[in-house]
Amino acid sequence: MTQFHIRKISPTVGSEVQGLDLMGDIRADAWRQMCQAFDQTGVLVFRDVDVDVPTQHRLVETLHHGGDLSKLDGINTDGFGYISNKEEEGGAPYGRLLYHIDMHWSEMPFQTPSLYGVEVDPGAAPTTFVNTVHSWKVLPDELKARVKGLSARHESGQQGRGRTTYEAELIQPDWARSHETITPIAMKHPRTGGTMLYVCEQQTREIIGLPKRESDALLDTLFAHIYKPECIIEHHWRTRDLVIWDNMSIQHSRHYVEGGGPVRTLRKIHAPYNELRHYMKNLNDIPTYAEAEPV
């Protein structure tokens, strides 16, 4: 096996972890290095690895809690979901997803999502990632001064604000009711303390207190800054890939997925698992999607 090593994927986002048997005992120093890379780069990529459901839970819960292995106590390590254009119960089965933070509209965006490639055909759509801590660090001073003290409203429902050139490709979730939250645009990360540029093109609707035209123009400026091509990485999926990311500091998007196109079945597990299950049970509203074409 390759010697344990962590390498940066790009200067701004992502690290690849190599030479680690995830199903075995992971040494304390390896956990420490992974947690450090996770906090610094926001995304961990593992290629060509065997990962069962309990192991995936162990990894995401431990990283989410900064290396605290005791947080696994009481977790139902059998639970998982799919993002898939093949599995009958697969979420987001087709279409394009704009850059977003999972559950940005809720009181529970502080999550650690993970996806594992169960079955991936060549040509399956990649997932793209961007680091909004970096976005804030390099935001011009005049824009920092302009947005400090401002808040934005984020909501569930239709993707975006109808301002893309590919509206027909966007998958639109069907919610029973709308959900929303208001947060500062310059937002502190709850674990690392880093400042994030905390708006996303999928779910941020407006900047509070600004006229619509001014709000839209400022959001467009911020999005153009966040999603610069040189700040983005693309992960091209293969079977047995595992990707774990920080849901608040890292935004992710997805290229167009065909319902009848290359199979793309990814096993999805988020931390903190128990708290999220409790929150969604009380919310009693899970989005549905039209069925994808059979593969």
Predicted feature residues:
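Non-heme Fe(II) oxygenase catalytic core, chiefly the N-lobe of the double-stranded beta-helix
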Residues: 2-242, 248-295
